Amino acid sequence: GKLLQEAEISCEIVCGRDFGGASEIRTIVPAEAQEITKEGLYTCLIRNDSPKKRELSQSISDDAFIRGKVPMTKEEIRHVSLGKLHLTEDAVFYDIGSGTGSIAVAAAQLSPNIQVYAMERKAAALELMQQNIEKFHLKNVAVVAGEAPDSMQQLPAPTHAFVGGSGGNLKQILEVVWQKNPLARVAINAISLETIA
């Protein structure tokens, strides 16, 4: 009751106790639940007729992520990059140089059936990425610590890959991706022409 009241959720609770007795079932509101002092086994159904609606968008605002000093792919770039990848329901997706994990999180939220491998070599980024994955309650993201392409060797073949950071190993990373799956679709973000040279 206290948790529901603090969350300011407007709901009713159908509460069952002493089945077979005169007061076996009653309907209460969260504030009344705090007043129940009788110990015993209760069965409750919480009914919320005005739940918060889940947004149907792959776009997550930058403010939603835990940031720190780790680089992050900005919202507009995430949106375009994931759109160009054309992820599918059963995709195996590599996020290489994941940083805060913003791309990994956005991809994983599209479908619980997408398996995301978020690769990062920097300890501070790995910690921040894990916090963001937990914040968004994602079960389909595996954090892979280490330098790509070495960290990719034991992973299943990707159907899609995003390269946000390559540590100077872009050519070798792409070779491993396409060795594992010659048809893998890849998106690369570059802030300098040297990246694609």
Give the role of each language-model region:
Residues 2-69:
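A contiguous loop/helix-start segment that scaffolds small-molecule binding in enzyme catalytic cores
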Residues 72-90:
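Conserved alpha-helix/loop element of class I SAM-dependent methyltransferases that forms part
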Residues 90-99:
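Conserved class I S-adenosyl-L-methionine
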Residues 100-112:
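Conserved SAM-binding loop of SAM-dependent methyltransferases across substrates and taxa
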Residues 109-116, 180-182:
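Conserved S-adenosyl-L-methionine
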Residues 119-158:
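S-adenosyl-L-methionine
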Residues 120-125, 165-166, 191:
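Short beta->alpha hinge that forms the Motif I/post-I loop of the SAM-binding pocket
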Residues 174-197:
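C-terminal substrate-binding/active-site "lid" region of AdoMet-derived donor-dependent transferases
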